[in-house]
């Protein structure tokens, strides 16, 4: 079975071809037009997707050495995401499927991230034959879920305010780093001291104020953003410039320690021996190192996506479509393109 996947949920235009668990192509075009604005401008994102969609799809088919007539299924992100951006990909995919007379399958973007750590192991073949804890962490979402052997999902924790990826980007902007600031903080933090300043770690055992962390797998990062802003306002520009790497390392340590503590605690509490981390923040080197160290100490298997599959990409869309078909699951026909749409049940 040959599946074309399309991804346009935010500011990456991507098309990929997957056949029997193997990624034949995965073309990703990251939009650079948002840098000057310090964040994604929805209207610009939609127009860029519209401009690039045909060329990116042609490139994916060409790299896979197939033609559009070889396709058996077309899958596309159906949300959550920027509504205009999602609609560009959906309309293109549905029109192409209708013209080729092949099935169209809408795919939930967050759900696709959850299974992205298994793409390199062969998509449908790589998923563990046991329940696992999924930490899906990106610029828009921070979710802890239990994934069953039947691919069922139960969310046990989520952000109460801001996502971890947004905390990286916004605090990085406060430090004068370019957008997206997450990778910039990761790079800069390698030169800094994570113990330079202790920023808050809300709803955790490390919190100096919270009393309600036990058995609570929700996240909160708005307080961290406020704390960083307030602290920076008290420092001189010269001091900030001199210690920029130390500040970046301290911010990163605060975010990573919360993600690591809650994810491992959830696995231990529910007696689950596998953890999968996905989403753009899963590319963060400190998060990977912290999770590898703690999972090794606790005897928990850790699944991480390759760097190319951490950020938004169409291979994960096609791979999840193939996984669902291989398990005999009926494609979801009803979907919501809303930014915070829930996963299909």
Swiss-Prot record:
Keywords, sorted A to Z: Acyltransferase, Cytoplasm, Iron, Metal-binding, Transferase, tRNA processing
Catalytic activity: L-threonylcarbamoyladenylate + adenosine(37) in tRNA = N(6)-L-threonylcarbamoyladenosine(37) in tRNA + AMP + H(+)
CDD domains: ASKHA_NBD_TsaD_bac
Localization: Cytoplasm
Residues binding substrate, per UniProt: 136-140, 169, 182, 186, 284
Cofactor: how and how many bound: Binds 1 Fe(2+) ion per subunit.
A single cellular component GO annotation: cytoplasm
Cofactors required: Fe(2+)
Main location: cytoplasm
Enzyme class, broadest EC rank: transferase
Binding site for Fe cation: 109, 113, 312
One GO term of the biological process aspect: tRNA threonylcarbamoyladenosine modification
Job of this protein: Required for the formation of a threonylcarbamoyl group on adenosine at position 37 (t(6)A37) in tRNAs that read codons beginning with adenine. Is involved in the transfer of the threonylcarbamoyl moiety of threonylcarbamoyl-AMP (TC-AMP) to the N6 group of A37, together with TsaE and TsaB. TsaD likely plays a direct catalytic role in this reaction.
Recorded family membership: Belongs to the KAE1 / TsaD family.
Name the record gives this protein: tRNA N6-adenosine threonylcarbamoyltransferase
Source species of the chain: Chlorobium phaeovibrioides (strain DSM 265 / 1930)
């Amino acid at each position: 079975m040959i599946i074309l996947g399309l991804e346009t949920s935010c500011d990456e235009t991507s098309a990929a071809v997957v056949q029997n668990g193997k990624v034949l192509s995965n073309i990703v075009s990251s939009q650079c037009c948002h840098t000057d604005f310090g964040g994604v401008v929805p209207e610009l994102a939609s127009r860029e997707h519209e401009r690039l969609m045909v060329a990116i799809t042609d490139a994916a088919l060409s790299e896979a050495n197939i033609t559009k007539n070889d396709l058996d299924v077309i899958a596309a992100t159906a949300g959550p995401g920027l509504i205009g951006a999602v609609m560009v990909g959906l309309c293109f995919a549905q029109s192409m499927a209708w013209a080729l007379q092949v099935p169209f399958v809408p795919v939930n973007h967050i759900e696709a991230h959850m299974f992205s750590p298994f793409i390199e192991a062969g998509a449908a073949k790589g998923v563990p034959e046991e329940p696992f804890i999924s930490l899906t962490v990106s610029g828009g979402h921070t979710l802890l879920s239990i994934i069953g052997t039947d691919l069922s999902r139960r969310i046990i924790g989520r952000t109460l305010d801001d996502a971890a990826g947004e905390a990286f980007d916004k605090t990085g902007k406060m430090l004068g780093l370019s957008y997206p600031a997450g990778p910039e903080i990761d790079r800069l933090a390698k030169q800094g001291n994570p113990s330079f300043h202790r920023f808050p770690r809300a709803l955790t055992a490390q919190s100096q104020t919270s009393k309600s962390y036990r058995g609570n797998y929700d996240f909160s990062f708005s307080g961290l953003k406020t704390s960083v802003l307030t602290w920076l306002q008290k420092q001189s520009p010269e001091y900030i410039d001199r210690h920029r790497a130390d500040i970046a390392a301290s911010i990163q340590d605060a975010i990573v320690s919360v993600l690591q503590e809650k994810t491992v605690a959830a696995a231990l509490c529910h007696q689950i021996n596998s953890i999968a981390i996905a989403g753009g923040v899963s590319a963060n080197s400190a998060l990977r190192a912290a999770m590898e160290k703690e999972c090794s100490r606790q005897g928990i298997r850790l699944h991480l996506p390759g760097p190319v599959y951490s950020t938004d990409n169409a291979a994960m869309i096609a791979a999840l479509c193939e996984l669902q078909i291989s398990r005999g699951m009926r494609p979801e026909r009803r979907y919501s393109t809303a930014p915070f749409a829930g996963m299909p049940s």
